[in-house]
Amino acid sequence: MVFFACSTILCAQDDSKWSLVREHQQKSFAHTIPPGNYSGITPLGDDVYAMVSDKSDSALYFNVRLYISRQTGELLQAEYLGPQGRVDSVRLDNEAIVRVSDSTVVIASEGKHRLKEYKLDTDSIDNGLWEWSMPSADFYPNYVFESAAYDTVHHRLWTVNESTLRRDGKPATTQDPHNNVLRLIAFDWSNRNASPVSYLYKMDMPTTMKMSMTYVMGVSELCALPDGKLLVLEREAFIPNIKLGAFCQCKLYVVDPEVETPYALDKELEPGAPYVSKRLLASWRTKLGLTKYLWANYEGMCLGPQLENGDQVIVLVSDSQDGYAGVLKDWFKTIVIRKR
């Protein structure tokens, strides 16, 4: 759970070709977007985006139209277009969605520990489409798959476990601070029968050691950039018993898998194992204040439009837990980046 009250973006000194141009303040559209548990988003074209809700036991996804300025990248308005498709089971806890072809999307289910391909714009379920899963025993509770991204350059589908797998240690906490070790997992979409390729990813250390009521630290989403690099969204959410003082630290990193060394998914961690390099693109921290309830637990991220000058918009969406207590909102945020 994450509470937002203020936001500051910090640019990092890195040697990657992507840099931050500007951020826009988060916005909610309570009059046009109904409360939900929106945890993933992907573009469908013509300013339409599909979003999954991790609590939906009926609709597969929900379409919205986002009106984003082609000059500045600011999100101007959002329009709800309604539910689409139907789920093939209950308690799927769908956390991420990504378009992988003109007619299909892949959805990451935390409840089923799987990634599964679905047809767009239909209520029928084709069980002959691609599906992949891992044993539930590999994961700690609520730390499964929260991410999905598709690289159109190299035709790869990406995901990552939200926090440390059991074989790799324990998830970091405020009382046991350490670097979570994750497995970035890539599937060759031109040869889907091939075994996935994985890479070791090391998260940053926790920024607090205070006692908490709720503490969540993990990668909440991936996004493939137009050149095949990956954006990795690290999220640290700290909530004390009194709620005041709660914060969420979000860090957006760029990773270039093309220059990294794979590490087998089923291989135990060994001393000297290769971790991918990461470069900080942006960082923001949000807090719960006495009078401001700008909660924004960002769990969805995807490419937005390119601006008239060629800059790239990144769209983020938060999970309001269905407008929890009438206070939390479904926030949207856009940032603009540039390849130099």
Task: Annotate the PLM regions.
Residues 13-340:
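Sequence/structural signature of beta-propeller domains
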Residues 1-17:
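Bacterial Sec-dependent N-terminal signal peptides
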